[in-house]
Amino acid sequence: ALPICTMNSFVTIGQCAITLIDTLNERIGRGVSWLTLAIVLVTVAVVIFRYCFNLGSIAAQESISYMHALIFMLGAAYTLKHNDHVRVDIFHHRFSKTTQGWVDFLGTLLLLMPVCLFIIISSWDYVSDSWEIQESSRNSGGLPGVYLLKSTIIIMAGLLFLQGISLAIKSLFSALGITPNTES
């Protein structure tokens, strides 16, 4: 169960938001990480069936691509939570904690969040058109539900936006010298 927070101050509200968002993205990230094992197992099965039994499956081959996409799309916010995205750090590490907090806060508000909103807005018609026709694979024997996979574009941007809220709050706390009591 997600933690329950009481809201009686700015810091407490911030801590609550951080905890809820970080917990959500942690669970999603850990969940989709198991897809890497599934990719390996399905790939091995596809190879064995193809070369040992001369049997092929378009659906199995497509499922590998679907799982790969899910790992990246649903794991992006988890990666941001753990600060594991590629980052060119020329100056940031030399700044004081306060300055780092302000840089991260402004970067989140001025770069990450607008990009997430742009992705959601610009992909909305693309995804809704796919839903409208219940798009499925173009290949005979392929997987149905391409529209579900395309929906992860919006979900990814939404999860990144939420994680951006958590990051912005953490950065603002750092910039203001506030040390919240969060376990995430």
Which residue stretches match the model-derived regions?
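Alpha-helical transmembrane segments and membrane-interface helix-loop junctions
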Residues: 6-184
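Short, small-residue-biased leader/transition segments that mark boundaries at the very start
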Residues: 1-4
